[in-house]
Amino acid sequence: MAQVAVTTQPTDEPSDGRMVVTFLMSALESMCKELAKSKAEVACIAVYETDVYVVGTERGCAFVNARQDLQKDFAQHCQGEGLPEEKPLCLGNGEACPGEAQLLRRAVQDHFCLCYRKALGTTAMVPVPYEQMLQDEAAVVVRGLPEGLAFQHPDNYSLATLKWILENKAGISFAVKRPFLGAESQLGGLGMVTDAGRPTVPPNDSYGPVSVKTEPMEDSGTSPRAAAMLIKTESEDPNYNVCNVQGSQHFSASSDVTGMELPSEESTRMVALETNEDPETEVKMEGNASPSNLVNSAAGVEDLRIIQVTVADNEKERLSGLEKIKQLREQVNDLFSRKFGEAIGVDFPVKVPYRKITFNPGCVVIDGMPPGVVFKAPGYLEISSMRRILDAADFIKFTVIRPLPGLELSNVGKRKIDQEGRVFQEKWERAYFFVEVQNIPTCLICKQSVSVSKEYNLRRHYQTNHSRHYDQYSGQAREEKLRELKRGLRKYLLGASEIVCPEQPFPNASPPTNSAVQPAEEVAGSLWEKLRQKIRSFVAYSIAIDEITDINDTTQLAIFIRGVDDNFDVSEELLDTVPMTGAKSGNEIFLRVEKSLKKFSIDWSKLVSVASTGTPAMMDANSGLVTKLRARAASCCKGADLKSVRCIIHPEWLCAQKLRMGHVMDVVVDSVNWICSRGLNHGDFTTLLYELDSQYGSLLYHTALKWLGRGLVLRRFFESLEEIDSFMSSRGKPVPQLSSRDWILDLAFLVDMTTHLNTLDASLQGHSQIVTQMYDFIRAFLAKLCLWETHLARNNLAHFPTLKSVSRSESDGLNYIPKIVELKAEFQRRLSDFKSCESELTLFSSPFSTTIDSVREELQMEVIDLQCNTVLRTKYDKVGVPDFYKHLWSSYPKYRSHCARMLSMFSSTHICEQLFSILKLSKKEAQWGAALQVAT
C-alpha cells in the first residue's frame, strides 16, 4: 500500500482547501497502515463549501483530486441525502435559491418512489405514475398528507409543502387498490433513472450485514461527519469490483459504471449483490457514531466521517450463489426455448429471439405468465420473478400470431446438431449417471436418451428425476453404483435387440443371471469387433450406399456390406452411418466411404460391386462415386472390374414422370385429402358409403409424395367414383373431371398400371434377394410391357380390366401405347447394368445349361467338368441355387470364386430403406443405435 506524500497536494488551492486535503491525506496514511494486510484500495472524500476533495490509492499509486467520477458520484449522493444541519442558501430577497428547491423536489420524488415500491411489494425502484394516479384517484391511495392537501407531482408543491413532506415522511404511505397496466414492466432492474437523469438504487439493497465503528482524528481533534469511501478488493482476477458505499445501507453505482455495459462476470456479480446471495460485506466506522461526539475540526471545514470497509473474500460462498443464479437463469431460458419451439411446431428447444419479440409486440403472444411478471430475457429478470415463472411453467404458452420481421420461422426448426461440435465428457458419467452409446447420451438409471450432449440437459434430467435417490452415493460408493448401472444397461440393450429383431438375437449373448456380464460401454465395441472378424473371413463382398434426410434435416449416408465366406454363408451387415454436411459431391461421398472401409481394414481387392441410387453424385462419369471406387479398386488389384448396380427397388418412382398422368393424380389427391382432412365431411362420407352399401367404408388418405400406395388409393377412388361426385357436389365443391369420359378412361388405365407396378414392387422387396432373382423379375416385367404394347395396338384390354370396364370404343386402347413405349424404354435403360454381366449371371444361376462358348476362358475347363458330373447335377436339381454352392467341391476353385462374387452382389438398396425405417422406430422408442446392426 503506497503512502501519500504531502507534495502531491495541488498548490493552486486556497488555504482552507489545502487544509482539507492535508487532513484527508493524514487520515488516508493511517488507514493504509490498517488495511495493508487486506490489499484494499482506499479513497477518502470530503465536501468543503461547493468543492469536493478526493485522495486515495489505486494499484499502489496515490492520487489527489484525480478521480472525477468519485467527485461527481459523491456530489449526487450529497444532493440525494441532503445535509440536515446545512443552512439553505438564500437569495438577497429572502427566497430560497433554485438549487434548494430542486433538491427538495428530488428528495420528495425519491420518497414517493420508495412508498410506491413498498406498495407494489417489490425490491426494485418503480417510477410513480403521477398522471394515471391523478386520473384514477381510487387506484392508489396516498396516506399521511395533511388535510386539504391533494397528491400531485412534487414540481407542483410549494417549498413549504415540500419541507413539511420531508419532515413528516415517516407517516406517508401508498396503498395500491388497482395496479396500473405496464407498471410491472419496470421491475427487476438494478436501479432506475429519474426525470432529472440521476441514477438511484433502492435504499434497502445492501451488500449484507454491516457493522459500523467511528474513529476520531487524533491529529485534528475532530470527528469528521459527511463522507463516503470507495474500496476495492483484489482477487486473482485482475478485474476488481467497484462499489461506492454511501452511508450504512445506501449504495449507488458510480457514473463510469452505469454509463457502460458491464462484462458478463461483473454483471453476474451485480445480480448476486442485488439478491443478497453475495459474499458478506463488513463496514466499520472507527470511534463513536453518536452525533454528540461530532465536533468541528477547523474553521469552515465540515465534519468528516471516516468509514472502513472490509469485504469478506469467501470464494466458495460467492461461487455457490452465482452458480444458483446461473442455473435458475438457464432453467428459465430452457423453458422459454421449449415453449417457443412448441409454438413454431418442432419438438425440441429453439432459441428465443427476445429482442424481436420485445420490439415487435403482437407478433408473439405469451400467455400464462405470473401476475406482475413481464416477459423478457432471463438476464433481465429478478430472482423472485424467475422462480415464479418456473412454478407456472405448465401454464405458460407461446403463440405466434404473425411472423417476426427478419426471422424465417420455417428455418428455425432446422437444427443441425452434428454441426454444433458437442462432445460427451467422461466426468458426466459419475456426476449424472449418463453414458454415450453411438454418440447419444443415455441415462443409466431410466435408459432415456438426450438428443444433445449438453451438460445442462444431463444435469436437468438427473436433478429432476433421480437426484433425490442417487445423491446419497458419493466417493467409492458412487463408483460402485456406476459400474452396477453399466452392467444393467447391457441387459437392457440385449432386450432392445430382441424387440427390434427377435429372430436375430445378439450373438453369444450371456444370460442375465451370468455374473460375468460385459460392461455396458463395451457392448457396441464388441459388436463392431465381431463384424471386423466376419469381414476378414469374406472371400468377396459388395457394398450398398443410399442417403436420406432425417427429421433433423441432416443427410445420413448408410453403407451396407454383403459378403460371402468360404462356406458360402451370406451376411448382410450395416457397416456405417455417416452424417453428410456441406457439399454432397461424389468426391465427398467417396472420402466418407473410403474412411469407413479403412476403419474396418477391408481388402479393396475383394470388392465386387456397388449398389447406389443412380444420382449424378453416384454415377457421374468424371467425378462420381462409382468412378472413384473403380479407380481405387483397380489400383489395389490389377484387372479388377467393379460392377455398378442402380437401384430398381421403386420402379413406380421411375414411371411417375414417364406415364405423365399428373392431371389424374392431382384431382384424386385433392379430392381424397379434402374428404379425409375434415372430420365432419369424412364422417358424412362414411355414412353415405354405408347407406349405398359400397364396397369400401372410407378412403385412404394420400399425398402426392409416394407412388407406393397409389394403386390402392386409385382403385378405391375409382370404385367409389359416383358416390364421391355426388357427395362433393352436395357440399358445394363440384369436380367437373369426375364426369368427364376421357378423364375417367385415364383414371382406369392408371389404376391398372399402378396395380401391375405394385405387384412387381412386392416381388422386388424380398429379404436377401439374389441378384439373379431380381434380374429375372425385371426381365419378366419387360416382357409383359412388350405384350401389353401388342395387345393395346389391337385394342385387346385383357390385362387392363379396369380400363376395359369403362371402354366404349375400339380405339380407347390405342391412346395408351405411347405411355407403354416410354415405360419400356426406361426399364431397358435400367437393365443395362445387368446386361453387361448377363453371361456371368447365367453361369451362376444355370451352370448345367449354359453354353461353353459364353464362359470366360479361365473357367471353361472347370465348367465342362461340372456339367459332366452327375452327382453334382443331382444335388443341383435337389437343392437349387444358392444352396448348391455349399456342396460344390473344392476341386473347382475358380468357379467357386466366381459364384462367391455373384452371390455377394446387392441387387438394390432395399436394405438401406429397412435401416431408415428402424432409425425412425429407434427415435420413438429410445432404442440405441448398435441394435440396428443386428436388425439388418
Swiss-Prot record:
- Where is this protein primarily located? nucleus
Keywords carried by this UniProt record: DNA-binding, Nucleus, Repeat, Transcription, Transcription regulation
Q: Where is this region: Disordered?
A: 199-222
Question: One MF term from GO for this chain?
Answer: DNA binding
- Subcellular location, record wording: Nucleus
Q: Name one GO cellular component term.
A: nucleus
Mind telling me which PANTHER family this protein's record contains? GENERAL TRANSCRIPTION FACTOR II-I REPEAT DOMAIN-CONTAINING PROTEIN 2, GENERAL TRANSCRIPTION FACTOR II-I REPEAT DOMAIN-CONTAINING PROTEIN 2A-RELATED
**Which family does the entry's similarity section mention?**
Belongs to the TFII-I family.
Q: What is this protein called?
A: General transcription factor II-I repeat domain-containing protein 2
Q: Which organism is it from?
A: Mus musculus (Mouse)
